[in-house]
Amino acid sequence: MTTTVTLTGTGVPFPSAERAGPGVLVSHEDVHLQIDAGRSTLMRLAQAGMNPHQLSALLLTHLHSDHVSDVADLAHTRWVQDHLHGTGPLPVVAVDGHAPAFVERILTANVYDVEVRVRHVQDGPPQVAGHWFQLPDVPTPVWRSTCGRVAVEAVRVRHEPVEEAVGYRITTPDGVVVVSGDTRVCDEVAALSVSADVVVHEACRSTALAEFVRDTPFETIFSYHADTVALGDMAERVGVPHLVLTHLIPEPTSPDQVAEYEADIRRGGFTGRISVGHDLMTVTLPSQTDPGPTRKGVQR
């Protein structure tokens, strides 16, 4: 058995031809979890050989538009194809706050198209199967596959002014994957990452660019994202074997700029494996690269 972790999008709100909006696909056998759905997620899933009807659930970390702009496309396309596959509504896992109303609104946006399709092909309007949970201050179970092999925990992360923001910990028979969502470096993600095999974490070069962004709106934006140097320190303290960087601020467009991300993480003291993410990068568990028997779950 293997579990794969595929980055369906590593970008930010600014559009990029190379990077779709944020998203991660975690797959174990026939269980497929999509975490977030930024712009072009549906197309990246198609490139990865994944159809919307195959998704076991969509997990939302928070409702910033760059993370949810393709939710409508996923839900609607799954509905359009349902007469072929019969898999029913898309399960959506999210905090029970603004998410239910958000999902309801996007499902009604294409009202004319829905009316036409219901008259001719579909059995009824598009729906989702909501799995809403209260914002948890400690890692809390929020979803489990029907086969019982894949379990998901969530915890609140620090992305204020966004209050309803969480990270996820996905456990399969092959190992543990953590997806931070958008957050500062924080104790909550550190706790979520203990004994994880792979941590997919957002990354912002705040320290390196501090003078450049001073007294600009970016100074505020950077304050609620994860500084790469601080992230390296946190990952080393927790003993993360493999750190995968995504939601890259700013977008690296050359090998030298990719190397700068790696250097920042090393400057923070991290000695494990680093992958600076790009769209459709895939990590397989059990890992093909042994991070060393002393790293996993080490508290320093």
Feature-to-residue mapping (PLM):
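Binuclear metal-dependent hydrolase catalytic cores
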Residues: 1-177, 257-290, 296-299
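Cap/insert and terminal regions of metallo-dependent hydrolase folds
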Residues: 167, 174-176, 184-278
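Active-site donor-binding acidic/aromatic loop of nucleotide-activated sugar
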Residues: 180
